[in-house]
Amino acid sequence: VWLFAVASVCALTACSDNDTENPEGEKTGGENGKPTPETVEFINSNLVYWGDEDGVGTDHFVLTLYTDMEVDAAGNPIGPGKIMAFSLNVPPFASGTTEFPLPEGTFDAAPNGYTFNEWTFNLGYMNQMDLPTGKVEVPAGSFYGDVKAHSTSVDADLLSGGKMTVKRSADGEYTISGVLVGDLSLKRYFTYTGKLTTIDRHGSTEEIPNSTLNADLTLNEWAQAR
């Protein structure tokens, strides 16, 4: 079950009327005319632990970060807002472990869609889903998404490069940040600070959606597969 904070949309980094975005996803008008990166500050999170459900030798987390958005009755965030999903490969937890916090580390892009090395994030891809209304494609793996204003529809950028860092303080608070690049060749600067509560799905035989976000008909039923 996914819970979303019902609150007003938080303010993101603003720019003057003269600021324009350059091809790297940065904004001009910074100090000495240098591009000023626009960093998305996420405030909501959801973390699911799947274990080594694919038998590839690494454990699998799905981390999803959101900006502050209202939600509809079905739990779908209503834009405008932003979302990032991360499919993460980590060293296996020891046998008998009962708690599964996201480990600290630096994650690089996996070299391809078939390699699941430790400390990598899996590349984004489109996954075809069969629904009563027909076949639709939804983003899977790691991706960035813009949630359209007054809508639950999401425009996704499939992530394929960059680096992200996960740090955890003594009191259990996380700081997650990085710069990732996707199919649109834009640099996605982001940060998140807050708690992460792990939802343990490893060993589950039931396929459970990773989110209830909709893109027109569906971004719900995001795939469990890496």
Residue locations for each model-derived region?
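Sec-dependent bacterial lipoprotein signal peptides
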Residues: V1-T13
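Bacterial Sec-dependent N-terminal signal peptides
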Residues: C10-N46, H202-W222
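N-terminal accessory/targeting segments that precede structured cores
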Residues: K34-V48, D52, V56-G57, M69-V71
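Edge beta-strand at a domain terminus
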Residues: T36, G162, V179-R226
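Surface-exposed helix/loop patches within compact recognition domains
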Residues: D54-T165, S211-R226
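Short beta-strand segments that buttress and anchor functional surface loops
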Residues: L65-D68, I176-D183
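A mature extracytoplasmic/lumenal domain signature
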Residues: V90-P92, A170, L180-G182
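A short, structured loop/turn motif at beta-sheet edges
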Residues: V166-Y174
